[in-house]
Structures are given as structure tokens and as C-alpha cells.
Amino acid sequence: MTKDSSAKRKAGKRKPEKLSFTQDFIPIKNLEHGIIETTDGRYIKILEIEPINFMLRSEEEQYEIICSFASWLKISPVHLQFKSITRKADSDKHIAMLRKETETEESEQCKKLSEGYIRLIKDVGSREALTRRFFLIFRYEELRRNENSDYGQICSTLLTAEQNARAYFMQCGNNILQPKDPDEATAEILYMFFNRRSCVEEPFHSRVDRIVLDTMAAKNKVIGIDPVPHIRMAHFIAPRGIDLTHRNYIIMDGLYYSFLYIKGNGYPNKVRAGWMSSLINAGEGIDVDVFLKRENRSKTIDKVAQRIRLNRTKLKSMQDTSTDYEELAGSIQAGYFIKQGIANYNEDLFYMSVFVTVSARTYEELMWRKQQMTDMLKSMDMYVSDCSFQQEDALRTVMPFLQISPKLEKKSKRNVLTSGAASTYMFTSFEMSDDTGVLLGINRHNNSLCIVDLFDTKKNKNANLNLLGTSGAGKTFTMQLLALRMRMRGIQCYIIAPIKGHEFRRACNRIGGQFIKIAPGSPHCINIMEIRHTISPEMELIDELDYSEMDSLLAQKIQQLMIFFSLLIPDMTNEEEQMLDEALIRTYGKFGITHDNDSVYEDRNAVPPKMKTMPILGDLHEELQKNEMTKRIAVIVSRFVTGSAQSFNQQTNVDLSNKYIVLDLSELKGKLLPVGMMIALDYVWDKIKSDRTKKKAIMIDEIWQLIGAGSNRMAAEFCLEIFKVIRGFGGAAISATQDLSDFFGLEDGRYGRAIINNSKNKIILNLEPDEAEFVRDTLKLTKTEIRSITRFERGEALICSNNSKVPVIIKASKEEQEMITTDRAELEAILKERQQEAD
């Protein structure tokens, strides 16, 4: 005898129920306008609610949310069912999109990396990642349709209740989904509930097609010729089988289910706001149902008063040493509490029942999860009971039809006032998951996949992102991980690395990118004086541009050069600025370039347009030496012409057509570093502006070098301008910094705050306590978030996007880890592996 069969035998059996078809078990008569008509004449509405990250809100915000929820409970339908369903995260759409993009990828290195990324998503999705859906279920309050309640009246009443719910849940921060086809959406919810296992392999649309084909074939109908016969809704959503023969579990669609309820007297005297979060986030295979029934206020007061009088009469005949005396005295005290709450605080009385559904693939796993759930609730001072020999009643109760079993209701119901009922607010398990985005990691609170699409203009006002973290928190690792995954999605990535640029080289080479080193003696050069064609043919076609009517390209370039020279010569006088401006115009004039835009082209009609030969710093140096007032500038510029940095005195010899480009500035020291960053930014910015139809991202590591105390206002303004306007060019500006004091060091932090305010997305890694307090107001962090951030381990972060915040554990595939790790032990292991492969 196998262990499984032995366990099942021990579980005990009862006489099998006579159930011919599973379709007959589902009490659905019709589904129209998103309203379910049940076989017993009730009308049900199911709404899906998007959760919020309740537990990361401040105490004040939590209180306001619960108050808004309590306000709605006062006017809500009398009977309510709140339902949460937990299941394995479905990453199929995201993976399918990645595979489709991989098919068009030309780089073999990128294809290989994409396969590793897909394996990571599958692995995390199958082992760790969960997703949760939340539902509000209410009904038309008349039990049966009568002459005075036609279907139009029923629809109108339910629609009004839905609109009220939307308004109040919006105050809580929750969005109620509005599907294009309410009937299809409701049917999909029911199909998912009854077919938890099958819905993974056979989506609802596939199930519908199969049922239609089978029905047509069974009735000898020809598809495309004969009309489709009427098919009951239950046929589309019914599971393949339901086994109701066991005392302590059922089997439905190949999964094992068991049911628990919190006893009516099994609650603690006080609970915290959001206490349901512990149940909701308990893990895989745990669903929660909360039933609320609001009592008539005037009748309740009369009943409570009558009960108090009766109990006081009984109490007089008892001795105070009796065991029942204390119980009766407590009942009287509770009665006064209810009466006072209703009369003085405008509260209602509710009857509440809470059910927990436990599911698993095997009986042993089911029993283990069930015990874990029982122990967890016990630790919260809540006591549960098993629905032994009542499994069918329990299943009918937790079905999304708002039909609680009277027997189970009697055992589980607990009377609560509005404030107590509001504490059951369960829509707290927020997920940040966009199928079109890139995976960042796993949500620490609920194990859901955290997939963020920075470029989703429907959700984000801009795609900008700030990365903040102390040294060693994983800032560079996270930036590279984000860049690699964007590259896999076909997004153009430019990385500017002013410090430790070598950390970016390995990943750049492995993905087939271009590594450009800007430094004295480097073979790479970007001519700072080059005027570039910044509009692609596609944008010329879209905008119908006429270059002759555009602002002067020469004037724009000179403006950029003035920023460059202000970084090089911070103490330049107004007179020197004027003389420099004139010298620049004369230098370009020698090459035939004027304020006439046509003058910058050698062949305007070529594809791409061919530009004239541009002057270099040496040409400007010659012009500066001719004027006594600019000789000081000429002396400083000579370093780039005849001195140690003469490698800057060349025509541009790098190509930015590669989709993954790293500009390494780490060899530039002192004053040369901000100058080099300006050269790199100027070049990249011109490329970004050329085509607004393509996604691109510019990533600036250690941005404090440009906007911090060691920079100047003009450079900071240029950098801020990028963050302000890059959205209009289809791009994202991503910055990273670890020195927060310098980040906010220029002009009392004006530029640091402005860049953060112009970035709707943030990744906050571990910060020191003083750093966290320093940016608390700027980042609008709560005390809870500050406490979490200061305790983060390496690779943990708080993701802030679209006014939502999620704590995540950042995940990388084996291939990505090898490409971007800087950990000494991991590098040593990689070296040994490569040496063994070489041998």
C-alpha cells in the first residue's frame, strides 16, 4: 500500500455523493451584462479590485484608508463577500513577448543572454513567484424576482452599487477594473476559480473554442454553416471533476482542497489595521473569504437592549462565584459597547465570517499547509476549526456566489461594529507587474514578480529613474542589470561611467556592445566641436521639417561649448566669455559654417546627410592666440592641443550606432572628469534627439559629478534639462549616485531635488540612517520605509513607481551574474571555471 493511499484511508471516507455532472454543481442559470443569475433566483455582481501597498503607508494614511472603507460599508449592499485568490505567477505573456523579440535580434550574444533571462523568469515563476487577485461580490437584495422588480431595475440597482464602490475604493487608493466585456471577464474569473490547474495549460478562450467544437460535433452541426446551438454557461467553466467523498478534503480539477474557518469566539479583543495582510500573504495555496452582513440599525438597538435586560435579570439570580457569572457579565458589557457604538458613534452592526481555503497538489502537502496556516493564526490569537464532514458546504460557501452555508455561518459568525468590519480591508497585497517591462526581482512582501515598464506612458508621466544607495549596496550591479535587460528588449542604452568604468567592460563585451574610453592617450575621441545632424529621416517625414527654418545649429552648438568651457575654466570673466563666443564664430567661419543651417552640410540629400569637416580644438586654439584677451583661455586649452590631453584634439572616430554603448571616463581626474562627462553627454544627447520613435535610455553613473558641489550651474542646468525634456524624445534618463551630500551640494540641493522630482521612478537600495533621514522629505518616505531601507541587505531595494512602492529582492540569471558581478569570491570562481574549460 502506498503512502498516499494510506494517508487517504486514514483521512476516512463517507458515502459518495450522487453528482452526475460537475456542470450541475455550479448554480449558474445565466450571465448577462456582467450579472450572474443563479439557479435559485439571485443576481450576483463580481468586481475585481486592484490592491495597494497598504503596509508601507504611514499610520496616518492607513487610518484614512480604513476610514474611507468604513464609510463605504455604511452604504454598501447588505450582503458582501470579499475574496482573495493566490496562485503561481503567470509569466507566459512576458516570456512570449521576449521570445518574439529574440527572433528578430541580430546579436548572437544578446540572444544567448535572453535565453538565460527567460530561464530565470521560468525558474523564479515556478518556485517562488505568486500572484493574487481580489474580488468584491455583492447581490441584488431581493431573494426572488417579482412583479415590481424587472431585470432593468435589477441592473440599475447593481450598477448604482458598483458606482458607489468605485467612488469609495478610489478614496482608499484602489482601482476597480472596468473590463471591455464584463460577461467575458466574469466568466474568466469563474473558470479560473473552478479550474485552478487547467487554466494554466488551457486559457479560457481555448476552453470556449473546445466546448463549442465538441458541442457542434456531438449535434452533427457543421462549423461555419450551421448556427452554434445554445450552450449553458456552466459548461464553459465547470471543472473536469469534483470528488466530494472525503471527510476533510475535496479534489477539484486535480487539486486537493481543504477548508478552515475562524471560530466565532476565536478572535482576539483587538486587531491592528490591515491584519488581513498576514492571511493574504501567507503563501501559495491560501485563499481567503470574508463575509459581512449588515444588520438594520433600529432593530439592532431594540434587540441589544432586550438582550441586556434579559441578561441582567439572569445575572441577579446567579452567585458571583459561578463560572457563568463572568461570561454573562461580559455579554452585558459587550451589549452596552454595541449599543453605545450604534447610538453615539453612528456605527452599524455586522455579522462577520472568515473562511480560509487551503489547496495543494498532493494530500501530504495539503495537510502540511493546513497545519502551517493553523499555527500562524494561532500565533495571531485566532483559533480555527476544520470543516470536517462539511466539505461540500464549505466549497459552496467559498464559491464566488455569496451563498454561505447556514450551518457554517452559525459556527463562524462574529458580531462587529463598522470599525471592526473595516479592519477586514484585505486589498493590501500590491503587485508591480507589467508584461511589457523588465524583471527587477521578487516582491519581498508577497513573492510576486516585480516587472516594471518605465516607458508605459499610460502609467508613468516619464521614464526617468533615480538609483540611490550607499557604497556596496549593489548600485552599479542594479544599473547594469537594468541596462542589459533593456538591451534584450531592443532598447538603445548609453552608459556614462565616470568612476570604475572597468566594471562595465565585461558585460559590454559579452553582449556585443561598444566600449568607448575617453581619456588622455585613448584611441577613442569625440570631437566636442562637431555639429551633428540630429534629426532622423523618420522624424523629418513625421514632422515635415525644413532645416532652413529651424533655429541656428551653430548657435545651439556654441551654447553647448560655453558650458564645456565653463567647466574647464570656472573663473572665466564676462569679457572672456564674449571674446570666446566671437572666436568660436570665426573658427567655424573658416570651415564655411555660418548661422545658415545649410552651411553645415556637404551633401544635404545624402542618406544620412553628409556633414562638412568640422573644426577641432586646435583650430580654436589658433584663433584664441590671436587676441590678448583670450590668451589665458588659449593657455588652458593648449593642454588639449599639445599637452597630455591632446588625444581630444581629433575628429570623432567612434560610432554610436551600437545598441549598447559604455563611455568610460574613469581615467579622467580632477577638472577633466566633469569636462569629459560633458563631452560624452553632449554626443549622446545629440543621438537621443535624432529619433523620437525609438526607445532609448541614457544612464549616468555617479551623477553628482555633474550636479554636485564640485560642478557648476551651467553643467547642472544642462543635466537637468535632459531629465526634463528626454520624455519628448522617447527616452529615459537614469541616474545613480552614492554620495547624497554631494548630490544635493550645489545651490542648496536645488538640482538634486529637481532631478528627483523629474524622475517618476526610483530604486532605493540600502542607505545609512543619516542618509535616509537626509532624503526622507525629498523622497516622501514613511518611517516604515526608512526603517526597511536602513536594514536592506545587498541586492534588496525599494522600487518606487507610479506613486506605488514595493520592496524587492533583485534577481539575476547565472549569465547576468557572471557578466556584472564585482564580488571577489564570485570572480575567483568564474576564473577557476574558465581555467578548467581551457584545460
What do the PLM-derived regions correspond to, one by one?
Residues 2-427:
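Extended, folded cores of ATP/NTP-driven motor/assembly subunits in large transport
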Residues 25, 35-36, 45-53, 59-78, ...:
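P-loop NTPase motor domains
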Residues 467:
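Hydrophobic anchor at the beta1->P-loop junction of P-loop NTPases
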Residues 472:
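Walker A (P-loop) phosphate-binding loop of P-loop NTPases
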Residues 475:
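Conserved lysine of the Walker
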Residues 478:
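Hydrophobic positions on the alpha1 helix immediately C-terminal to the Walker A/P-loop
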Residues 512-516, 749-764:
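A short helix-turn-beta junction within AAA+ P-loop NTPase domains corresponding to the substrate/partner-engaging
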Residues 781-835:
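Conserved P-loop NTPase
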